[in-house]
Amino acid sequence: MRRFKFQYKETIVTILTENEEFYKTAVKAILEARSEIEDYILHNPDFFTSYEPIECSGGEIINRMCNAAKIAGVGPMAAVAGTIAAYAVEKMIDAGAKLAVVDNGGDIVIHSDRELLVGIYPSKLAFKVPPVDYLAICTSSGKIGHSVSFGKADAATVVARDASVADALATALGNLIGDFGKKELEKTVSEFYGKYSDFVEGILVVKDELVALAGNLPSLAFAESKEDLITKG
């Protein structure tokens, strides 16, 4: 397994795969996805600025983001990182990669032939992810990162089979988290999962010392976050 770092404009990713050829495949896909998004924004500025779903008529990447936004009730840019990560992983799979993991600033898409430990930053929790054909783990935070969140969660994490939806729903979930006690947090998480259970495997929220979860999540473990393994801007 090799670990690569790549940065282009706002996109900062960590890529795990077998060799440099698959890494190059991922980089090419990331640049393709960004190009489509940037071109669409140039002609449709609302796509970039809206905090609510909007009608879109674009290519594959744009349509994925807009469909996810409609499901989650957020703006399409809430799905940008997960969508780009997913597109890169899909191209790596097409090229024959048995290990294709793209972490785009905390929005992670996994195709793996081995167990992986995926940390939930900034908490000390991690998921033990077994070998899996395709899984998205997307996290929104009201305390770190440059993405917009109107909530106060340390981490609002959504695990799903669709990365665009996982990313958009992580934003929506994070927006709901206020200065909650344990019961309020658990109630919010339970209701959110009940509303979106058709789209997600499970959800987890970390707020200060509190943790609430729902659904079918990978096993949890404690793990110290190593600064050099965290993908952030």
Curated annotation (Swiss-Prot):
InterPro entries, alphabetized: ApbE-like_sf, MA1715-like, UPF0280
Classification via HAMAP family: UPF0280
The family this protein is said to belong to: Belongs to the UPF0280 family.
Protein name: UPF0280 protein AF_0649
